[in-house]
């Protein structure tokens, strides 16, 4: 076993001991999780939030801050380039790659430093398309959006929330200018048998016939799926009094990443990243342990198109939802290897204990 693999396995074992049972998580004080990163996690930037992988997995798009500029980091070289410095604007709250490589932005036309959060509301945040060649300013699509839109990774299709309802449309180009076509309402929150704040998250691969979304303040917060054609809604997290917010989805559609407080149930300021099965079992697996460190949390994860890597952000307790303090890369394959080694060692230890107990009978 090489040093990095050994370090990863040791950390998994240590963190597992810290979280053996609900309600007994030990708090690590006086140190940052960034000081004790396992071999399968690497810090990419020292600022920024809301990462999004390019389709080839070589670059990550991110915001400098809420209502800030958009940047892109090249993972191989670490080179960061600005994407929105070539024109004046009022700042953005979302930036996502479209299927053709252009960028979908969400941001208001006006920003007031004395009332900043108004620019994030659905009354003011608009959707725009910025061409990948950065040949000019973005073009407004004529729609306002509550929080984050869902963007297809395969088609020029988006879904968004407005007025407690979900809408879907295709982005088409006429004379080189993007616009929406075929807009239709796919869900009205008033038709649901429960009350919740709604937000679109992802089209579920591989066929993208289902939309994964958040149901805020329903039984805590639940991960839901909407069959786009039939309108059927499924609860995938099924965890009352627990916070489960869907984030990045795996390319095979079998799992989604979630921000979750299952380990302590203290709410959004104590979240970490989990992997949730979308087979109806509500099975979860914890991937990060940043909230074990006093004052920290991990959030806003996304998955690369090949399913190999996860990008996420570090944040501090007290930060507003979505705020990040740097982007990190999580090697999912390396993690799985380290986890298997840990499980193998645990099994060997259990077998040895059993043999010793038998000998003492």
Regions found by a protein language model. Give the residues of each.
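Sequence signature of WD/YWTD-type beta-propeller architectures
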Residues: 24-361
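Bacterial N-terminal signal peptides that target proteins for export
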Residues: 1-10
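Bacterial N-terminal signal peptides
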Residues: 10-19
């Amino acid at each position: 076993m090489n040093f990095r693999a050994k370090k990863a396995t040791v950390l998994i074992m240590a963190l597992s001991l810290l979280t053996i049972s609900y309600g007994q998580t030990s708090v690590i004080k006086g140190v940052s999780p960034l000081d004790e990163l396992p071999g399968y996690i690497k810090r990419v930037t020292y600022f920024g939030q809301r990462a999004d992988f390019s389709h080839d997995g070589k670059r990550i798009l991110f915001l400098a801050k809420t209502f800030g500029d958009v940047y892109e980091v090249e993972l191989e070289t670490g080179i960061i380039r600005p994407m929105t410095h070539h024109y004046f604007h009022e700042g953005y709250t979302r930036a996502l790659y479209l299927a053709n490589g252009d960028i979908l932005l969400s941001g208001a036309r006006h920003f007031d430093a004395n009332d900043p959060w108004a620019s994030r509301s659905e009354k003011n945040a608009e959707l725009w398309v910025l061409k990948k060649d950065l040949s000019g300013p973005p073009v407004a699509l004529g729609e306002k959006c509550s929080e984050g839109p869902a963007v297809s990774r395969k088609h020029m299709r988006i879904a968004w929330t407005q007025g407690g309802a979900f809408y879907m449309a295709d982005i088409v180009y006429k004379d080189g200018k993007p616009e929406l076509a075929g807009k239709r309402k796919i869900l009205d929150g008033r038709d649901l048998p429960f009350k919740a704040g709604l937000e679109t998250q992802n089209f579920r691969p591989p066929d993208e016939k289902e939309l994964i979304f958040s149901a805020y303040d329903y039984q805590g917060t639940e991960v839901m799926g909407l069959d786009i054609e039939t309108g059927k809604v499924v609860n995938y997290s099924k965890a009352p009094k627990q916070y489960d917010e869907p984030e990045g989805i795996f390319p095979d559609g079998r799992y989604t990443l979630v921000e979750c407080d299952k380990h302590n149930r203290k709410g959004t300021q104590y979240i970490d990243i989990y992997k949730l099965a979308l087979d109806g079992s509500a099975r979860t697996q914890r991937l990060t342990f940043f909230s074990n460190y006093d004052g920290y949390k991990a959030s806003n994860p996304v998955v690369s198109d090949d399913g190999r890597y996860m990008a996420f952000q570090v944040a501090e307790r007290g930060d507003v939802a979505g705020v990040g303090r740097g982007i990190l890369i999580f090697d999912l394959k390396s993690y799985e290897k380290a986890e298997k080694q840990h499980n193998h060692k645990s099994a060997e230890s259990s077998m040895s204990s059993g043999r010793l107990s038998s000998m003492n009978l």
